[in-house]
């Protein structure tokens, strides 16, 4: 038997991945078991989708691949029904096993250009960046979008280092021809400033996953972001 027949990929369950949303006003929700507490992540994600979340990212650094796949299998029907992409953090193997819509990697994960070769040209590839140089490398590697942070400091990533503030985000948004999201400690009080700095949306964990009412929290973020986008457009 030829070796290539042993490693031939399984046929895809979904031939056309759901694309990354176009335009501005993106609310990008990242799962977190600690922020969820005793509540089921499936219930929280369902509520966020009802509230209008544009992207769901499956993130869990501390569980085996098998458990992450199981959670992804529970989330996929929810995101598919909503027409919203499901992106897997870091774990390319889990993303491929699920036939998820994309992968998000950080600076210490598998290099973005390698991930792009593995997942192919159609799936979403997100990259965490903190500098213009990192953002340019991500763009050259075939990234679909970049998330810039940690902006304000976040308990969800205690090893993230000191917050970088909004100026690096503004510089990246001016320089790189990719959608730019802000991430790191974003909430209703500061989301507008992220949009005014040039981001097309915000990536959040606690602001939605940890909220008493995730649906209402997602809707409230929408309202704040929409207002900030209007303000930015009027300012020229």
Curated annotation (Swiss-Prot):
Gene3D superfamilies: Aldolase class I. 2-[(2R,5Z)-2-carboxy-4-methylthiazol-5(2H)-ylidene]ethyl phosphate binds at residues 154-156, 185, 205-206. GO terms for cellular component: cytoplasm. It is an enzyme of class 2 (transferase). Coiled coil: none annotated. It catalyses: 2-[(2R,5Z)-2-carboxy-4-methylthiazol-5(2H)-ylidene]ethyl phosphate + 4-amino-2-methyl-5-(diphosphooxymethyl)pyrimidine + 2 H(+) = thiamine phosphate + CO2 + diphosphate; 2-(2-carboxy-4-methylthiazol-5-yl)ethyl phosphate + 4-amino-2-methyl-5-(diphosphooxymethyl)pyrimidine + 2 H(+) = thiamine phosphate + CO2 + diphosphate; 4-methyl-5-(2-phosphooxyethyl)-thiazole + 4-amino-2-methyl-5-(diphosphooxymethyl)pyrimidine + H(+) = thiamine phosphate + diphosphate. Mg(2+) binds at residues 90, 109. Its cofactor is Mg(2+). Its EC number is 2.5.1.3. Pathway: Cofactor biosynthesis; thiamine diphosphate biosynthesis; thiamine phosphate from 4-amino-2-methyl-5-diphosphomethylpyrimidine and 4-methyl-5-(2-phosphoethyl)-thiazole: step 1/1. 4-amino-2-methyl-5-(diphosphooxymethyl)pyrimidine binds at residues 57-61, 89, 128, 157. GO terms for molecular function: magnesium ion binding; thiamine-phosphate diphosphorylase activity. Disulfide bonds: none annotated. Binds 1 Mg(2+) ion per subunit. GO terms for biological process: thiamine biosynthetic process; thiamine diphosphate biosynthetic process. It comes from the Bacteria. Keywords: Magnesium, Metal-binding, Thiamine biosynthesis, Transferase. The keyword Magnesium applies. Condenses 4-methyl-5-(beta-hydroxyethyl)thiazole monophosphate (THZ-P) and 2-methyl-4-amino-5-hydroxymethyl pyrimidine pyrophosphate (HMP-PP) to form thiamine monophosphate (TMP). Belongs to the thiamine-phosphate synthase family. This is Thiamine-phosphate synthase. It comes from Roseiflexus sp. (strain RS-1).
């Amino acid at each position: 038997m030829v070796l290539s027949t042993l490693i031939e990929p399984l046929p895809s369950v979904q031939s056309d991945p759901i694309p990354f949303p176009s335009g501005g006003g993106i609310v990008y929700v990242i799962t977190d078991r600690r922020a969820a507490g005793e509540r089921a992540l499936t219930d929280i994600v369902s509520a966020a989708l009802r509230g209008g979340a544009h992207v769901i990212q499956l993130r869990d650094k501390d569980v085996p691949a098998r458990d992450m796949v199981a959670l992804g299998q529970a989330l996929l029907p929810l995101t598919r029904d909503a027409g919203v992409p499901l992106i897997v953090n870091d774990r390319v193997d889990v993303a491929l096993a699920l036939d998820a819509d994309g992968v998000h990697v950080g600076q210490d994960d598998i290099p973005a250009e390698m991930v792009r070769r593995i997942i192919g040209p159609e799936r979403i590839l997100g990259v965490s960046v903190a500098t213009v140089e990192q953002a340019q490398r991500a763009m050259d590697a075939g990234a679909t979008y970049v998330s810039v942070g940690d902006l304000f400091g976040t308990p969800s990533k205690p090893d993230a280092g000191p917050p970088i503030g909004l100026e690096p985000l503004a510089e990246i948004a001016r320089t790189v021809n990719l959608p730019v999201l802000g991430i790191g400690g974003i909430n209703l009080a500061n989301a507008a400033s992220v949009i005014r700095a040039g981001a097309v949306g915000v990536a959040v964990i606690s602001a939605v996953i940890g909220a008493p009412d995730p649906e209402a929290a997602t809707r409230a973020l929408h309202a704040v972001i929409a207002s900030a986008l209007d303000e930015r457009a009027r300012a020229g």
